[in-house]
């Protein structure tokens, strides 16, 4: 049986109410991106960065998975090991929708990482203050998020799985961080879902849905069915 990859970005979780860098309101407007999302910013002002991620956890607690998260969870249940679910998002909405084995390329917001023993543990939506590592009891902790200027270990997993993928599906990502057009060209067939037209990106894909993922996801599910039957989308 052939393998499918769904790679998602901010456009997957935006309908749930999670703000992105491109929004003009909400959490992000108060911050300079490089101050709170870069290794340099963390070295300069760790408290500001940790406070920022505390605020993001609070925001995450107050939103729910949307229909697209739930549909992807159903697709994963149906296709199992033949469907790779990869996301640039750091939220837990796919997991809350019941999706198993999600690969988070840029880390996971509910988790902290110990700077002493490198242990990773889940604190849900709580603040980092007064937390300690369950392994070594250290309080020298940070968010388990890959910031700008840091290595993303999960990229190795992404590229390994891409080499096994026949149908590549890109959902809600502009290609600004990852070259999804190049990924599409590595696979037999490809589907793109974006909210606004982008001719430079569209040219790499076989099928394109320029619409909200809530409207597109059921069509994409049908495309997967067709691909698994006869290799076409």
Curated annotation (Swiss-Prot):
Q: What is known of its domains?
A: 2 residues (Tyr-53 and Arg-56) present in a large hydrophobic pocket are probably involved in substrate specificity. They are important for desuccinylation activity, but dispensable for deacetylation activity.
Protein's UniProt keywords contain Protein transport: no
Q: Which UniProt keywords apply?
A: Cytoplasm, Metal-binding, NAD, Transferase, Zinc
Q: Where does Zn(2+) bind?
A: 114, 117, 133, 136
Gene that encodes the chain: cobB
Has the keyword Nucleus been applied to this entry? no
**What is the enzyme's main class?**
transferase
Its EC number is 2.3.1.286
Identify the SUPFAM superfamilies for this entry. Answer: DHS-like NAD/FAD-binding domain
Annotated protein name in UniProt: NAD-dependent protein deacylase
Q: Which residues form a coiled coil?
A: none
- Name the coenzymes or cofactors required: Zn(2+)
Q: Where does NAD(+) bind?
A: 9-28, 88-91, 172-174, 213
Q: Which residues bind substrate?
A: 53, 56
Q: Where is the active site?
A: 106 (proton acceptor)
- Listed GO MF terms: histone deacetylase activity, NAD-dependent; NAD+ binding; protein-malonyllysine demalonylase activity; protein-succinyllysine desuccinylase activity; zinc ion binding
Q: What does the Swiss-Prot or TrEMBL cofactor note state?
A: Binds 1 zinc ion per subunit.
The protein's location, in the record's own words, is: Cytoplasm
One Pfam family in the UniProt entry: SIR2
Superkingdom of the organism of origin: Bacteria
- Name the family the entry cites: Belongs to the sirtuin family. Class III subfamily.
GO cellular component annotations of the record = cytoplasm
Any idea what job this protein has? NAD-dependent lysine deacetylase and desuccinylase that specifically removes acetyl and succinyl groups on target proteins. Modulates the activities of several proteins which are inactive in their acylated form.
Q: Which reaction does it catalyse?
A: N(6)-acetyl-L-lysyl-[protein] + NAD(+) + H2O = 2''-O-acetyl-ADP-D-ribose + nicotinamide + L-lysyl-[protein]; N(6)-succinyl-L-lysyl-[protein] + NAD(+) + H2O = 2''-O-succinyl-ADP-D-ribose + nicotinamide + L-lysyl-[protein]
Q: Which residues form the Deacetylase sirtuin-type domain?
A: 1-230
